[in-house]
């Protein structure tokens, strides 16, 4: 995960658009994937579901007590979260749902509007 000031947006905001390898939010454009939390939106180097590891998702596990729900947008297609990752989310008592990035962005925006304690890992769609 990038350090503050390096691929960091300092608050939780809706995602306005996604595609072409990035996202638009907060009046700016970002190329690449994102980790979104109540304390901000971070650049995230993951580019495919093959790169989803416990280490890649560690920022979510570290913030589990600050979240009620975590979304994983895995790109264009639906996918099943591997058992080892589901188990890790269970171990930290954090509900998780895996879906295509578009669905995750829409769900993020709805949960944010409801003022829910939500986090998301969003893999950029080409």
Regions found by a protein language model. Name each.
Residues 101-106:
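Short acidic loop-to-helix transition motifs that present clustered carboxylates
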Residues 1-55, 113-126:
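Non-catalytic interface/targeting segments
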Residues 43-45, 78-81, 107:
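Short active-site-adjacent helix-start/loop capping segments
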């Amino acid at each position: 995960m990038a350090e503050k000031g390096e691929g960091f947006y300092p608050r939780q905001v809706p995602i306005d658009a996604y595609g072409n390898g990035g996202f638009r939010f907060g009046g700016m454009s970002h190329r690449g994937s994102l980790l979104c939390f109540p304390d901000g939106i971070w650049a995230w180097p993951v580019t495919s579901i093959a790169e989803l590891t416990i280490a890649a998702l560690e920022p979510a596990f570290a913030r589990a007590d600050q979240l009620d729900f975590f979304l994983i947008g895995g790109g264009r297609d639906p996918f099943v979260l591997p058992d080892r990752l589901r188990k890790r989310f269970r171990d930290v008592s954090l509900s998780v749902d895996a879906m295509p990035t578009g669905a995750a962005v829409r769900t993020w925006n709805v949960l944010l509007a409801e003022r829910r304690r939500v986090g998301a890992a969003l893999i950029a769609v080409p």
